């Protein structure tokens, strides 16, 4: 019970942190980010940032996190859509009411497979945190928690999500859904694209903030798909 309480307390603190940043957001400058992450002498050189991220470096700054997350769209392995079969496999194991040691092993394997495709997969990071909490693996828990913190802050620092003019920016549609709990929300059932603004909104279930929708800018996703002849998200 203490482990679960710790997890929920940590999640709540992240959600509070996201709301506290509402007045301090700025949209990503993709042109500048692209220049910086491709320059080997830059402190924002993407391979260097990825190395810090994978190590769970707590000294990674917000700006470094933004360059890491949004700079990923310029990497050859970037895929804006979910294609891995491990999504369903992970969901199947997580749907169980209780877990065995074998389940924990499977959760870590499936999560790692998903993170190879998308290093910022919040669902996979959360799943790993669940296992490490149950195993009392404080070192790995701390590293993964820092990785999740970097992703959450990179997204939350781009807008307030309250309108199509101040949306949160994401590089993958799945990140929209996965960031909602950290903001204190649950999905309300409707997902709609405003193509003229390259914005997508999700309706929300009843919440203590009285917010009905959250808006996300999905321009990196649409631009990537359009450059390759279109396709489904």
Residue ranges and their predicted role:
Residues 122-123, 150-164:
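Boundary/linker segments of alpha-helical solenoid repeat arrays
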Residues 133-156:
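TPR/TPR-like (Sel1-like) alpha-helical repeat modules
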Residues 96-97, 114, 131:
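Residue-level signature for tetratricopeptide repeat
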Residues 1-26:
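Bacterial Sec-dependent N-terminal signal peptides
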Residues 103, 110-111, 143-147:
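Alpha-helical solenoid repeat scaffolds, predominantly canonical TPR units
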Residues 21-104, 165-233:
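N-terminal alpha-helical interaction modules that lie
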């Amino acid at each position: 019970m203490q482990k679960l309480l710790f997890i929920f307390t940590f999640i709540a603190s992240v959600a509070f942190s996201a709301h506290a940043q509402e007045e301090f957001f700025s949209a990503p400058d993709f042109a500048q980010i692209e220049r910086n992450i491709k320059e080997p002498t830059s402190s924002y050189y993407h391979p260097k940032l990825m190395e810090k991220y994978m190590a769970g470096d707590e000294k990674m700054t917000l700006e470094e996190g933004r360059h890491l997350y949004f700079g990923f769209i310029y990497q050859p392995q970037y895929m804006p859509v979910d294609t891995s079969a491990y999504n369903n496999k992970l969901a199947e194991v997580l749907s169980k009411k209780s877990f065995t040691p074998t389940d924990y092993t499977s959760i870590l394997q499936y999560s790692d497979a998903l993170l190879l495709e998308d290093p910022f997969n919040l669902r996979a990071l959360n799943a790993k945190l669940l296992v490490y909490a149950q195993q009392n693996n404080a070192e790995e828990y701390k590293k993964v928690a820092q990785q999740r913190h970097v992703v959450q802050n990179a997204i939350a620092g781009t807008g307030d999500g309250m309108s199509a003019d101040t949306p949160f920016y994401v590089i993958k549609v799945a990140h929209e859904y996965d960031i909602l709990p950290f903001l204190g929300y649950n999905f309300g059932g409707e997902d709609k694209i405003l193509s003229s603004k390259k914005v997508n909104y999700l309706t929300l279930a009843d919440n203590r903030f009285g917010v009905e929708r959250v808006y996300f800018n999905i321009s990196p996703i649409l631009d990537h798909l359009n450059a390759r002849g279109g396709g489904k998200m």
